[in-house]
Every structure is written in structure tokens, then in C-alpha cells.
């Protein structure tokens, strides 16, 4: 039965205003609009009054429900029929954990009420609906009762067969089109031959499974193909040339080409995690480094948010499923799209081609896609520390003549690093009888055919098949699964996982055969054992769907009980669906129909399918030199600063958590003004060392329109000039991931791809000593469609994205682009690896003037590049560089401007020594870097450059000033002069425009004003206590350790760093999951202190922290336990971020909290990840003793941190009772409500509160993520190991003595 509950208002005033503007532009006669959430409960039986009240309370979150009955025409947006939203999965979990067991499922809709000036036509209705829902993910109904269709269960469907025995090849050709299999001609022949030999017809599920497992996406046929170019047979395949890098330089690589990610040697450090007794401890061992970079281009083109989200999720699973289980650590992301054409901010180089209806626009992709990728990383608990963003769309004369080149099919790149134990690097053996398990969420009828669909050029598959290949994300589920994997690898030799793969393209139809095949086994499977949320699915849909957040594992039968216990504790769903067999044969039995939908020898599925041969011709291109006769230097610089590849990208950065783990040593934001210009990302290898890992990226795709090989060489070289800013040592420590995107089959592109791979794999990388142990290819980067009877095509340039990964010796030595004005006299030097060639082909300058040019930059001298890296490493190690920034997109002028922005300083630059042509000198994108050197170190630095054969490439540029002005001169002639603050504003315009479209425009305007303010003083810190004094030391010396419960719920992700901070303060930190309290494995009375940790409990679906709190309040046993703990005067409680929200929701059982507010959505309506300044007030909080009067930065990472009071008197009560412990302050040190100094809009900057007796504290920012100095994005140079926030944890230790 269905019960309906009204929810809170769903759209704020500014969101409704944005909608009104869109309706006006679309000429829709909407006079009024209101929207609220509506909840649908599918019940097994009628609820009692008490149960109804409980469920009603549970579904009360967000702003208070409007007191009126809405009027107007009702349009209710619901999840697409036949799918289950991730909101539903998590909300239903909460209901069950609150004892509401009659609830089969909860689902949520968004009810719009419109008033119209006149009756809408059906065409206008369609247009209206397109503005309020995503047809890929959602549907529309008009009455709440119609939502019953969401819960309808169908009878199971049987498989179908394709009659090739009588219908022959034609029958299979028809099935190929109808099922969207993307089978090649020779594969059709192969299947007809093999099934004829087996004497039976194939089932649809078998064909589908074959198509997924053998798609270009999964099998990389082009990279494994034989090649004939211009009639000449080539010696090696593309993949062999990539593998050549490993053959030439195998140093430090532990696993390559055979697993979900590659592994290289890491550092020996203290890895921090709980032992089987629950206590967190350091474990001194090798933390080897794994690396992986994936693309998710096709799903992102179709539906950007879930496409990018599941792209990140799939890559995270690849890392976790490496070896016998590993831990993902930090992520990177990248986007290439066509021109944005922002309304009201159109640029002179943008004259967009139209696009097919089935794909999203570039602007929509860049609004929704990054939010999807960030949301997944945030909720999973992985910091996103690195990225690139390029736009390109231009009619150019390239290898195939004049045509439109661009990214209508976007690149969405997701990658990262993780750590793995030495004994788990290699996968184990799969014994006969091993249990074959699916870990993770249920099968759903979504994401069908992603592998095959992404292998087709966009436009070749039917639109409804594109529709079917969109996936759905549930990162909180993936976090639960990862916690299980963590518990397994933490057992060391007792790890129950023998073999593990993630479930990606093709679903179980690809993952399970791969698992058993890689283990040299076959498998017997039971279809109906697979967890499924939809009874009516056919065998094909159950086996082949791409439901996310799943892994397949082999576990020895004797370890099954242990594995089961670990899953139950983490509330991670799993199912034993089969056993490994001696015979390499795959059988899938269906208990419902008592038949075998699959019954195939493994060698038919994964055997020697026909090998591809590419017989292609190479092409040449004659570009025309850049015409710069009409180009004005100032205008050119302004245009380049607005080009997305150069422009400030804060809008892509602050949406992503960059502090979770407590091990981030270098994120994108640099210096006291937090400017996003870091060259590389750096993490510490553990919470107790300065060893670490670094990541950087390189890509120069437009260059491939003139020279394929040069583009590939530059991508590799740029990744090296970026990562050179940190302390690596030997260049052989750097390992690369190569992601190749190409429009295979497009004129000239195949031969060009071969040239590019050869340039990198056979030549440049071996010469530099670099290895490419991992990578990915996407070979269908072309979009075709028909418009007004005419075929249109947009083809991407050959795009190689290189991601570089390396072990770091000492993360503290990383150099940033921030120019320093506080270090005495200094000089700026350019190391010009372009050797004065100053080529302008395919540069940002060319692009903003709608040109391509002729000669692009290239690697001029490989030996100089290697020497450059070695010289920078010597200078970084000796700490002789004040600042470093490589030359890249936008050229030298952009490099210098970014350094000045980071240093909030001026420049006086002289370019006479760099060449005769001003534009070529300033805008060429040849390799190189600018360094800032103290005057007193100049001769030492010149000596090092001389020893490395670089002094002839080193040019003095001028000096740094304290003025608000950037000046560039040639001799006595002033070429350029403008205020730095004005240029800073131009550079920030892109972010401002994107934030205004996507977020609260008022917040966007406030941030834009702050960026342009020449008086902005940047961050500072002042402590009223000695940062180096360990006030807990005398108590630790007694050997006594108070016990603290490091409390987490499903979806919490900040518990490791929290435990580490308390461990350092002398506590016995115990890992306590809410399931432990439910099942009485622990009781709170056995602890002296309790900390509720940050993250996304239940994915924040019923209000941040709300579901977690209500699972306590609505459970009598837990309610009593927490009430007793809070009432005990000898205990301490801390709630941070999600824990803060949760504890605030428990105020009714915490003494002295009557004045506490609750925490609601940020004013910006966006997840905010920033460093922010806070001031500590004088209160009686035991947690903040001795800290009053201090101000310092802290990590902020939340979407719902704004305080909301029940009534106006509450704020005054807080002040009267003196419970406001900390406030956000601006750079002038005043409490503020201005964004982004106050990232959530809380009144008076309130961000931390105490209860009346000082024992309980709640705070939204994260002290545990910055308890070490090294993990602060910015900090004063005189801070040593302990950060300013370590005092809070030591205060707690002193109190509990």
C-alpha cells in the first residue's frame, strides 16, 4: 500500500528566480511557481499512529514546511519508472534502522505547482517539463497517487534466443542492431561458427555478454591490432609500444598491465588503522602506491551528473580492487568540451555549431559533470586534488581538410592514487570450490550496454540505447564496500579476499567471467542469488546491467564466515552467487525457470576472437602562419585570461573535498590568498611521516591538429615540468598513465595515433627513463547527426592526457607558484626549453583569434628536458627556490600573471633577451619554467643550472614588486602595464559567471568582489598559546590512556584522521560503528569520551546528520545509552561536521543545549570545500581551554553548515549563555557573514558551539584534518610538526586526567 507525506519547500528564492528567467526566455506564460518535496512510502501493512508520527518526523528535514496548501497545476518529478534512486536506497535503510519495518521502500518526488497566464499548448508543456527534469533519470506525473507505478513489481521475464541455426547470419545481424551489440563483421562470423559447432542457438544474454566482454571498451582491439600504414606493415601494435617503456625501465614497478591499477614502490611508513581488537595503531610497513586513470566520456555526454559521478566511482573501485584489496587515497579529474557559450558572456572566438538533442551542451556538461564527479568523491571520502579543463570547438584546416574539430563528445577523466600492502600486490589463487561473491548494491535495470555503447561513435546507436546506458551513483554504498575491503586487507595474511575485480562496463557479464578466467577457472552461478531490486528483470538485465558500487570476489570457503561478519558490521550487502570450477566453462542457472540462460565454454566467450588489422594512410597538413597583424597585446592577454584552459577554475575546485584523510600536503589552492595554481598535488604517505606521493597532469590536444607526435611529446613533458615542483629525486621514480582519445577511422587519425604512440612509447619515454604501466583508450571521439537533411560532424582532436605519479621524499619541500615579497631581494629566471623557437601554432593565443597557425611547440631537446628535471630536483631538495611555475597554456605572460596572483604582488618584466616578436615571446607555449630565486642564492642556482647544461637556456626576466601592477618592457619601451587586481578580476570572470549560473548569485558576486579587492590581506594566524607545547605530555607519561569511541555510521569517512589526532593526544582510540552499539558489541559506558566523525552518514538524504540522529532517538536502547553518557559529568563529547549535525539533532537528550540551532543547507546551495579563518572566543568549553583570542585557518568541507534557529530568541540565548566558541572571520579579523570567508552564511559567522557545562562541543570545520602543520593548505612558516588545532585534542586529554 502507498502512503504519501508532504515534505519541505525544495527550491530557495534564488532557484525559483532562476527558473522564472528560463521560462521567460523560453516564452512560457508562467506567472507563479512553487516547489516542495513529496515522499512516497510503499508499505507492507498499515502503519500505527505512532509509526506514522515517527515516519513523518523522519521525513521532516530541510526548511520548515510552508503553512499553505500549494495551488496551481501540479507536475511531480519522480525517478524514472523502473529505476530506484540512491535517495530511496539510503532513506529506506534509515527507516529500517529506526525500526520501521513495515516500510518496504521510500521514494521522493519534487512537486512543482505552476500558475499560468493562459492554457499551455502540448508543445509548451513539453518545453516546460524539459526545464524541470532530466529525462534520462526522471519522469513526470500529475497526481501523487500515480506514484504507485514506482513500486509495481513485474513477473520475471525469461531469456530469448536468436535462431541462427535456421536464420543463419542474418538473424545475428538483426539482433546486433536491435540489442545495440556493436559487433564487428568478423565477430558475427565468429559467433555463427562457434554456436553452429555447439549445435544450438545463442541466448540473448550470451550474445550480450560476448558483446560487452569483447567491446572496444573492454578489449582495446585497436591498441592490440596489427597495423599497415601507407602499405607498409608495422612491426609493433600500439600496446607493444606502450609496453616497451616497461621493458626499457622496469625500475620500481611492482605490477603493470594485468590488474585494475598499476602498482609502484612506495615508502616505509606507519600506516594507521584499527586492529582486530578495535584499537587504532600505527603499523610500520611499505605503503606501495597504486595508480589508475579512467574515462567516462559517453555517459557524461548523455547525462553529465551521473555520467561523471559513476566515472569517478568506477575508477575508485578499480583502485580498491587492485591485488587482493587496496585503499584509494586521492583523486584527479579532467574535462574537455566544446565552447561553453555562457549566456551574456559569449566570447569572440565562440561561434558554436549546433548539437544533436541526445547529448548535453558543453555548458550543461561543465555545470553538472564536475558536480557529479565531486559529489561522488566527497561522499566516498576521497580528496580531489588535481585536474584540467579545456574547451575547443573550431572550424580548422587540418589533416582531413576543413572541418569542425571539438569535443561534442566530451572527455571526462577520473583518476587517482591509493596504497596497498606488499603482500597484497599480486592476486591470489582461486581454488576449485572458492565462493564467488558479489559485494555491493542490488542489480537494477540501468546502465545496460555501457561498454558497447561507449565503443560507438556518438550517433551510431539508437537514442533509447543511449538512454539505457546511463548509470546511477550511490557513493555511500561504495564507501561501505570499501570499509569491508579495508577490514580484509588490514588482516594481513588472514585477508579472506583471494581475488577481486570491480564491476564496471558490462556488469556481472564482464566481471564474473573475467574473475574466474584470470584465476584459470570456470564458474557455476545461480542467477536468482544475485541481489536484485526489480523482480521483473530478464536474465539478460540481471546479469548485464551496470548497477554501480559492486565488486566481484573469490573467497575460500573456510573464510566465508569471517567475510560475512565483516560485511554485516559495515552493513554492506553481499551475495554468494556461485563457485569456481576446475573446468573452464561458464554455467548460469535460473532457479525460477529451471533452465540455463548461459552454458558456454570460456574459450568461446574470451577466446581468440578475430584480431583486428588497421590498414590506413597517413596525411600531412600545411597550416598557415598565425596572422597577428591585427592583434593588440593587451586585448590578446585579456582574451587568453578568459579562455577556460587558462582562466581561474575555482568553480571546479571548491565543490570538491580537498582535506579528507588528513594527508593532503598540497592541494590546488596556494598561499594566503588561496589561488588555484598549484603545479602538482602532494599527499603524505601516512599520518606520521613526511614521505608522500605526488600527481601531475599534462595534455596539449590542439597541437595534434598540426602535429600528432608533438602533441603526445608535450603531454608527457608537461606532466614532468609540473611534477618537478616537488621532491622526488630520480626521474625513474615517476610513472605515467596514458589516456588516449581518438576518432578512430576518421581521415588521417589512425596513422596519427600510431605516430603519437610511437613518439612516446618507442622514443621519448625510454630516452627519459619513464614507464607507462597503466592507461586507457577511448577510440570513438566523434559526434554525427542530421539537421535539416544535412549530416553534421564534430570530431575531437587526438587527445593524449598524461597523468604522472611519483613517490615523494619530503612533502615539505614542495615549491608553489606563490611569489614572495617577504624574502628580501630576489630575481625571476626563465628556463626556456623551447630554445628561443617561440612557436605559436595551436596556442591559446591562436585559439582566441580563431586561428590554428602552422608550427606548434615541441620537445626541442630530450636531454635538456631530463637535465631540467634533475636541476629542479637539486634546487628543490636544497630549498633554493622561492617559487616555481611551469610555462604552459597561455604562455609566459599567463605563467607570470598566475605567480603574481598567488603572491598578491606586482611584476617588472623585461623581455629583450627572449626574442624579437613580443607576441611570440609572451604567448608561445614551449616547455620551460619560471623560478624565483633569492639574490643571495643566485650564483648557487646558476652553478646548478650550469652543471646541468641549462645556463644557455636561462634568461633573467626581472623582479617582483610590492605594487598592484604588472609591467612588461622591451628595453626602454613599456609594452604592457595594468593593475594586477584588474587582471585578477578578468582571470576570475569565468568562475564568477559559472557560479552565478550554478550557485547562489549573491554568493558568487561577493566572492568576485573579494578577489578583485586590492586591499585583501590574505590569511594570517595568531595563537595565544605555544603551538609547540604538549600540555598532555605529563599525563601521557603516566601510561594511562582514556578510551575514546571514534564513532561512525555508514557513510562516515573522516574517522581515520580523527582517531590519529586523539591517538597523538594520548587516547586509546577505538573504532566504534553504530552497528556495534546496535548489536551490543560495545557500550558507551565503557568510554571516557565520544567523538562523532565527519562524512555523509546515509548520504545526508534526510538532512545532514538527521538520519543518524533519528536512528538513535527512535531506538529506545540507543536513546537510553546516549542519554546516560551525555548526563555523566565525567565524559566528553565532540561532534565534527556530519558529527556536529548529528549531535545537534540529539540536543533534546544533551543537558545545556536548549539554545542550540540545527544546521541546514549552505547559503551558496553548494558543497563548500575551503580553508577558512576562525577566531576562538572566551567560553567555558573544556575543549578550547587556553585558545581564546587565537585565530587560524581550518579545513571546511560541508554542504549543510548554516545555523538555523527554531525561534528568534535562540541566538540571544546562545550569546547570553556564552556558548559560541568559534566564528568565521574575514581577512581583517572581523566576524563575517560574507562569502566565502564565511563559507555557509551562518549568522555572525557561528561555526562552533559548546553546551553549558563545557563538556560537549560541536563544530562544522575539521580540526582533525589539520592537526599536523603539513596538512594545512597554508600555514605560517614557523609552525613545526604540530598544527594549531592539535591543542584541542590535548585539552581533552588534560581534562580526563
From Swiss-Prot:
It comes from Pasteurella multocida (strain Pm70). The active site is at 1137 (nucleophile), 1262, 1264. PANTHER family: PHOSPHORIBOSYLFORMYLGLYCINAMIDINE SYNTHASE. This is Phosphoribosylformylglycinamidine synthase. Pathway: Purine metabolism; IMP biosynthesis via de novo pathway; 5-amino-1-(5-phospho-D-ribosyl)imidazole from N(2)-formyl-N(1)-(5-phospho-D-ribosyl)glycinamide: step 1/2. It is found in: Cytoplasm. In the N-terminal section; belongs to the FGAMS family. InterPro entries: Class_I_gatase-like, FGAR-AT_N, FGAR-AT_PurM_N-like, PurL_large, PurL_linker, PurM-like_C_dom, PurM-like_C_sf, PurM-like_N_sf. It catalyses: N(2)-formyl-N(1)-(5-phospho-beta-D-ribosyl)glycinamide + L-glutamine + ATP + H2O = 2-formamido-N(1)-(5-O-phospho-beta-D-ribosyl)acetamidine + L-glutamate + ADP + phosphate + H(+). Its main location: cytoplasm.
Amino acid at each position: 500500500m502507498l502512503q504519501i507525506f508532504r515534505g519541505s519547500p525544495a527550491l530557495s528564492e534564488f532557484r525559483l528566480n532562476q527558473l522564472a528567467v528560463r521560462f521567460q526566455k523560453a516564452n512560457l506564460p508562467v506567472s507563479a511557481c512553487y516547489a516542495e518535496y513529496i515522499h512516497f512510502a510503499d508499505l507492507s501493512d498499515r502503519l500505527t499512529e505512532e509509526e506514522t508520527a515517527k515516519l513523518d518526523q523522519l521525513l521532516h528535514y530541510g526548511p520548515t514546511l510552508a503553512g499553505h496548501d500549494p495551488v496551481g497545476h501540479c507536475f511531480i518529478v519522480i525517478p524514472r519508472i523502473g529505476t530506484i534512486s540512491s535517495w530511496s536506497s539510503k532513506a529506506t535503510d534509515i527507516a529500517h534502522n529506526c525500526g520501521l519495518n513495515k516500510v518496504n521502500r521510500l521514494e521522493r518526488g519534487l512537486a512543482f505547482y505552476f500558475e499560468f497566464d493562459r492554457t499551455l499548448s502540448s508543445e509548451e508543456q513539453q518545453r516546460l517539463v524539459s526545464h524541470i527534469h532530466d529525462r534520462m533519470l526522471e519522469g513526470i506525473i500529475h497526481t501523487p497517487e500515480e506514484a504507485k507505478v514506482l513500486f509495481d513489481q513485474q513477473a520475471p521475464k525469461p531469456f530469448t534466443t536468436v535462431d541462427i541455426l535456421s536464420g543463419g547470419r542474418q538473424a545475428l545481424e538483426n539482433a546486433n542492431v536491435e540489442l545495440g551489440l556493436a559487433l564487428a563483421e568478423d565477430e558475427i562470423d565468429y559467433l555463427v561458427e562457434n554456436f553452429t559447432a555447439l549445435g544450438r542457438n545463442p541466448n540473448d544474454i550470451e550474445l550480450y555478454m560476448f558483446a560487452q566482454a569483447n567491446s572496444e571498451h573492454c578489449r582495446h582491439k585497436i591498441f592490440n591490432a596489427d597495423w599497415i600504414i601507407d602499405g607498409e606493415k608495422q612491426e609493433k601494435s600500439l600496446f607493444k609500444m606502450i609496453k616497451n617503456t616497461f621493458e626499457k625501465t622496469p625500475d620500481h614497478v611492482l605490477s603493470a598491465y594485468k590488474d585494475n591499477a598499476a602498482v609502484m614502490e612506495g615508502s616505509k611508513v606507519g600506516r594507521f588503522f584499527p586492529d582486530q581488537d578495535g584499537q587504532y595503531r600505527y603499523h610500520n610497513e611499505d605503503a606501495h602506491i597504486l595508480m589508475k586513470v579512467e574515462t567516462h566520456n559517453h555517459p557524461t555526454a548523455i547525462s553529465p551528473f551521473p555520467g561523471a559521478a559513476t566515472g569517478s566511482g568506477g575508477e575508485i573501485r578499480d583502485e580498491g580492487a587492485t591485488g587482493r584489496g587496496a585503499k584509494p587515497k586521492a583523486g584527479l579529474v579532467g574535462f574537455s568540451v566544446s565552447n561553453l557559450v555562457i549566456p551574456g558572456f559569449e566570447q569572440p572566438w565562440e561561434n558554436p555549431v549546433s548539437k544533436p538533442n541526445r547529448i548535453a551542451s558543453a555548458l550543461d556538461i561543465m555545470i553538472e559533470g564536475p558536480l557529479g564527479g565531486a559529489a561522488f568523491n566527497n561522499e566516498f571520502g576521497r580528496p580531489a586534488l588535481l585536474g584540467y579543463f579545456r574547451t575547443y570547438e573550431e572550424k580548422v584546416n587540418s589533416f582531413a581538410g576543413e572541418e569542425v574539430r571539438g569535443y561534442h563528445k566530451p572527455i571526462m577523466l577520473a583518476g587517482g592514487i591509493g596504497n596497498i600492502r606488499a603482500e597484497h600486490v599480486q592476486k591470489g589463487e582461486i581454488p576449485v570450490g572458492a565462493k564467488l561473491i558479489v559485494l555491493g548494491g542490488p542489480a537494477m535495470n540501468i546502465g545496460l550496454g555501457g561498454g558497447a555503447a561507449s565503443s560507438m561513435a556518438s550517433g551510431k546507436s539508437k537514442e533509447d540505447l543511449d538512454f539505457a546506458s546511463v548509470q546511477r551513483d550511490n557513493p555511500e554504498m561504495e564507501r561501505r564496500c570499501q570499509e569491508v575491503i579495508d577490514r580484509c586487507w588490514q588482516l594481513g595474511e588472514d585477508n579472506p579476499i583471494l581475488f577481486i575485480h570491480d564491476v564496471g562496463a558490462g556488469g556481472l557479464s564482464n566481471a564474473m567471467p573475467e574473475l574466474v578466467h584470470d584465476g584459470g577457472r570456470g564458474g557455476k552461478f545461480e542467477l536468482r542469488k544475485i541481489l536484485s531490486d526489480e523482480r521483473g528483470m530478464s536474465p539478460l538485465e540481471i546479469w548485464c546491467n551496470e548497477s554501480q558500487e559492486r565488486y566481484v570476489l573469490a573467497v575460500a570457503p573456510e573464510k566465508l564466515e569471517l567475510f560475512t561478519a565483516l560485511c554485516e558490521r559495515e552493513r554492506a550487502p553481499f551475495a554468494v552467487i556461485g563457485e569456481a570450477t576446475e573446468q573452464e566453462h561458464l554455467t548460469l542457472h535460473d532457479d525460477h525457470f529451471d533452465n540455463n540462460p548461459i552454458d558456454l565454454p570460456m574459450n568461446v566467450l574470451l577466446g581468440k576472437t578475430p584480431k583486428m588489422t588497421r590498414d590506413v594512410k597517413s596525411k600531412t597538413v600545411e597550416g598557415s602562419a598565425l596572422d597577428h597583424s591585427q592583434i593588440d597585446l593587451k586585448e590578446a592577454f585579456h582574451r587568453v585570461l578568459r579562455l577556460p584552459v587558462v582562466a581561474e577554475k575555482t568553480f571546479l575546485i571548491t565543490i570538491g573535498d580537498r582535506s579528507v584523510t588528513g594527508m593532503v600536503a598540497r592541494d590546488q589552492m596556494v598561499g594566503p590568498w588561496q589561488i588555484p595554481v598549484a603545479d602538482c598535488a602532494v599527499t603524505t604517505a601516512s599520518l606520521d611521516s613526511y614521505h608522500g606521493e605526488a600527481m601531475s597532469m599534462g595534455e596539449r590536444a590542439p597541437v595534434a591538429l598540426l602535429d600528432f607526435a608533438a602533441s603526445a611529446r608535450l603531454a608527457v613533458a608537461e606532466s614532468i615540468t609540473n611534477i618537478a615542483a616537488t621532491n622526488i629525486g630520480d626521474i625513474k621514480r615517476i610513472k605515467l598513465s596514458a589516456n588516449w582519445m581518438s576518432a578512430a577511422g576518421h581521415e588521417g587519425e589512425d596513422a596519427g595515433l600510431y605516430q603519437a604512440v610511437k613518439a612516446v612509447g618507442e622514443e621519448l619515454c625510454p630516452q627519459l627513463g619513464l614507464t607507462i604501466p597503466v592507461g586507457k583508450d577511448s577510440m570513438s571521439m566523434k559526434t554525427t547527426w542530421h539537421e535539416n537533411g544535412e549530416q553534421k560532424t564534430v570530431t575531437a582532436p587526438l587527445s593524449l592526457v598524461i597523468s604522472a605519479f611519483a613517490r615523494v621524499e619530503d612533502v615539505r619541500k614542495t615549491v608553489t607558484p606563490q611569489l614572495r615579497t617577504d624574502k628580501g631581494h630576489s630575481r625571476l629566471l626563465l628556463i626556456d626549453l623551447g630554445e628561443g623557437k617561440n612557436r605559436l601554432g595551436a596556442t591559446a593565443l591562436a585559439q582566441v583569434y580563431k586561428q590554428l597557425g602552422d608550427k606548434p611547440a615541441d620537445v626541442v631537446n630530450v636531454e635538456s628536458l631530463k637535465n631540467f628535471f634533475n636541476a629542479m630536483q637539486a634546487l628543490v631538495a636544497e630549498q633554493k627556490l622561492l617559487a616555481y611555475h611551469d610555462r604552459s597554456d597561455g604562455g609566459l605572460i599567463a605563467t607570470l600573471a598566475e605567480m603574481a596572483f598567488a603572491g598578491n604582488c606586482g611584476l617588472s618584466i623585461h623581455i629583450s633577451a627572449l626574442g624579437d616578436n613580443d607576441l611570440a615571446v609572451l604567448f608561445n607555449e614551449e616547455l620551460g619554467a619560471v623560478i624565483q630565486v633569492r639574490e643571495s642564492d643566485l650564483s648557487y642556482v646558476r652553478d646548478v643550472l650550469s652543471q646541468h647544461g641549462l645556463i644557455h637556456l636561462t634568461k633573467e626576466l626581472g623582479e617582483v614588486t610590492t605594487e598592484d601592477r604588472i609591467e612588461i618592457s622591451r628595453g626602454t619601451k613599456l609594452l604592457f602595464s595594468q593593475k594586477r587586481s584588474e587582471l585578477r578580476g578578468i582571470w576570475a570572470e569565468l568562475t564568477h559567471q559559472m557560479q552565478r549560473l550554478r550557485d547562489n548569485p549573491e554568493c558568487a558576486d561577493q566572492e568576485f568582489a573579494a578577489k578583485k579587492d586590492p586591499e585583501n590581506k590574505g590569511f594570517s594566524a595568531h595563537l595565544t598559546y605555544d603551538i609547540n607545547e604538549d600540555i598532555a605530555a605529563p599525563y601521557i607519561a603516566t601510561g594511562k590512556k582514556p578510551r575514546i569511541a571514534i564513532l561512525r555510521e555508514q557513510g562516515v569517512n573522516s574517522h581515520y584522521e580523527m582517531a590519529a589526532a586523539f591517538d597523538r593526544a594520548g587516547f586509546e582510540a577505538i573504532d566504534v560503528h553504530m552497528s556495534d552499539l546496535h548489536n551490543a558489541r560495545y557500550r558507551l559506558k565503557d568510554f571516557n569520551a565520544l567523538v562523532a566523525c565527519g562524512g555523509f552518514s546515509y548520504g545526508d538524504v534526510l538532512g545532514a546528520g538527521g538520519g543518524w540522529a533519528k536512528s538513535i532517538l527512535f531506538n529506545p536502547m540507543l536513546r537510553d545509552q546516549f542519554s546516560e553518557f551525555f548526563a555523566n559529568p565525567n565524559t566528553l563529547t565532540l561532534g565534527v561536521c556530519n558529527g556536529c549535525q548529528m549531535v545537534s539533532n540529539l540536543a533534546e537528550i544533551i543537558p545545556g543545549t536548549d539554545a542550540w540551532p540545527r544546521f541546514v543547507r549552505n547559503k551558496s546551495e553548494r558543497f563548500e570545500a575551503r580553508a577558512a579563518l576562525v577566531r576562538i572566543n572566551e567560553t567555558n568549553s573544556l575543549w578550547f581551554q587556553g585558545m581564546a583570542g587565537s585565530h587560524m585557518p581550518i579545513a571546511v568541507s560541508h554542504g549543510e553548515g548554516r545555523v538555523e534557529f527554531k525561534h528568534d530568541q535562540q541566538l540571544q540565548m546562545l550569546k547570553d549563555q556564552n556558548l559560541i566558541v568559534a566564528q568565521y572571520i574575514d581577512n581583517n579579523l572581523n566576524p563575517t557573514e560574507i562569502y566565502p570567508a564565511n563559507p555557509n552564511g551562518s549568522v555572525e559567522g557561528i561555526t562552533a558551539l559548546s553546551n553549558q557545562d563545557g563538556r560537549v562541543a560541536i563544530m562544522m570545520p575539521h580540526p582533525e584534518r589539520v592537526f599536523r602543520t603539513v596538512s594545512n593548505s597554508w600555514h605560517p612558516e614557523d609552525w613545526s610538526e604540530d598544527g594549531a588545532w592539535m591543542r584541542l585534542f590535548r585539552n581533552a586529554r588534560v581534562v580526563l586526567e
